[in-house]
């Protein structure tokens, strides 16, 4: 069984309490999404990390107890629900001492559509981050070409400024962007297929 391929295979393998590899894979896949999700709801970095840890621990316990039914909803929605209750518990425990940035957490936490959007945005960010890391580590793409793409697409640096800083032509900037985008698109598609039944 290839636990790196799909959420389905990973979930099946999680029933084996002795399979630490699959748990590590699951953790690597979902912890960053959960941390980003909590941060986007106004939690501090430390509280976001704590919420992610509590959510993952609760997930594993409930999953192994047979409480997750794929017919009733997607894994992402279930993780959002667990995280939501962990955040509400944090608010209750803090009894007014905890101040969230931005909108009221209660309003945000009651808006399922907003929560789903925050989750999906974080999921997309995680996929792109993983794809960029893979492109940098495993491809023969020139690091300068990748830097062009990052400057343009991640940091929104104007093409002329990228060309000036890297001492290349604007035409070369656009060529580099196109090459990296094409390679990155293929990696993203493969990674998305690993999350195939979790959207």
Residue ranges and their predicted role:
Residues 2-10, 97-120:
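Internal acidic/polar
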């Amino acid at each position: 069984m290839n636990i790196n391929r799909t959420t389905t295979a990973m979930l099946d393998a999680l029933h084996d309490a002795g399979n630490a590899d699959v748990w590590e894979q699951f953790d690597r896949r979902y912890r960053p999404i959960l941390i980003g999700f909590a941060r986007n709801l106004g939690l501090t970095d430390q509280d976001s990390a704590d919420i992610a840890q509590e959510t993952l621990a609760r997930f594993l316990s409930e999953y192994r107890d047979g409480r997750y039914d794929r017919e009733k909803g997607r894994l992402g929605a279930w993780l959002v629900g667990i995280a939501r209750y962990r955040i509400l518990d944090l608010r209750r425990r803090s009894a007014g001492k905890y101040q969230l940035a931005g909108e009221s957490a209660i309003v945000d936490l009651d808006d399922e559509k907003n929560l789903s959007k925050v989750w999906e945005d974080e999921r997309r960010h995680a996929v792109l981050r993983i794809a960029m890391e893979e492109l940098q580590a495993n491809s023969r793409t020139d690091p300068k070409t990748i830097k062009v793409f990052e400057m343009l697409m991640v940091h929104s640096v104007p093409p002329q400024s990228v060309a000036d800083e890297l001492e290349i032509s604007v035409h070369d900037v656009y060529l580099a962007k196109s090459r990296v985008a094409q390679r990155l698109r293929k990696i993203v598609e493969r990674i998305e297929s690993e999350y195939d039944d979790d959207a």
